[in-house]
From Swiss-Prot:
Keyword Cell inner membrane: no
One GO-annotated biological process of the protein: symbiont-mediated perturbation of host cell cycle G0/G1 transition checkpoint
Subcellular location, principal: virion
Name the record gives this protein: ORF7a protein
Domain of life: Viruses
Length: 122
């Protein structure tokens, strides 16, 4: 029991937080700085912006920010190329328009409109 408490104490005192971001290769990623006076530790080009934000080019990279209070924020960017899966998802959305439920509701609305128009003409 003492060992478990000791290990949890070590984990909480190290204060290392991990952040994961997935992006499309070649685009720019906009992230928020974890602390305003942090020290950047990494080999990727870092572009500080207004409102405690920064921009990085999306490549598979690993970098960190060390804050003044001792907290370390580790970031992992995972670059992916555009895959055909994105286009498959769009086709699935278009097919949902012609689902059986939609067709049943459309047929009912059509029949109701036909009967109400027929009654008005009589």
């Amino acid at each position: 029991m003492k060992i478990i408490l000791f290990l949890t104490l070590i984990v909480f005192t190290s204060c290392e937080l991990y952040h994961y971001q997935e992006c499309v290769r070649g685009t720019t990623v906009l992230l928020k700085e974890p602390c305003p006076s942090g020290t950047y530790e990494g080999n990727s080009p870092f572009h500080p912006l207004a409102d405690n934000k920064f921009a990085l080019t999306c490549t598979s990279t690993h970098f960190a920010f060390a804050c003044a209070d001792g907290t370390r924020h580790t970031y992992q960017l995972r670059a992916r190329s555009v895959s055909p899966k994105l286009f498959i998802r769009q086709e699935e959305v278009q097919q949902e328009l012609y689902s059986p439920l939609f067709l049943i509701v459309a047929a009912l609305v059509f029949l109701i409109l036909c009967f109400t128009i027929k009654r008005k003409t009589e």
